[in-house]
Amino acid sequence: MKIKEVIEEGKNVLSKNNIEDNVIITRELLAFVLGVKKQYLVIHFADELNAEDYIKFKENINKLINGKPLQYITNNQEFMGLNFFVNENVLIPQPDTEIIVEETLKKCKELLLKNGKIKILDLCTGSGAIAVSLENFLGDKSEVFASDISTKALEVAKNNNEKNNTNVRFIESNLFENIQEQKFNIIVSNPPYIRSNVINNL
């Protein structure tokens, strides 16, 4: 089966299961299975897909139909122009959370007029998306700390810190429990506020 035919099949299956953006999702999924960029699919649309890759593609289509988010299948989510590793140990960074980063950066700009360096805490960091993004934009103008109660979430956040070549410092803590001695110019937080019984429907 040709790549273009596989994309058409995937799109139709997702459409029948009321999954929106089915063309985009199908292409992202196939690119993930093949380990290529989406542009490759356009250039090689007439190429034959081997049986092994087709089986993997079908398996992942079934995961989508059964409610597994694309980001947990590909282990990737773009946020603030950066790529973040995500798995079931963290919530998927949402586009509207970028507003928090943007507003924090505005506040940082004001504070930097008065301070040579600012200290920021991202409380309940999860994937580390907010902390890593802030450190990426501010660089050596800031010291960014990130905390979470979950060891597994911190492992993901540390992975993203390394992946994006940032220098966030991590603290395992239940809210302020292990960071009471620290003082910060800015504390930012976007804790999990979604009811656990609806997470799989996001």
For every predicted segment, state its role.
Residues 7, 11, 58-61, 101, ...:
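A generic alpha-helix structural signal
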Residues 18-22, 37-38, 69, 112, ...:
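Secondary-structure boundary/capping signal
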Residues 5, 21-24, 52-56, 95, ...:
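Generic recognition of short, well-ordered alpha-helical interface segments
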Residues 32-107:
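Conserved AdoMet
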Residues 14, 34, 41, 49, ...:
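Generic leucine side-chain signal with a strong bias for well-ordered alpha-helical environments
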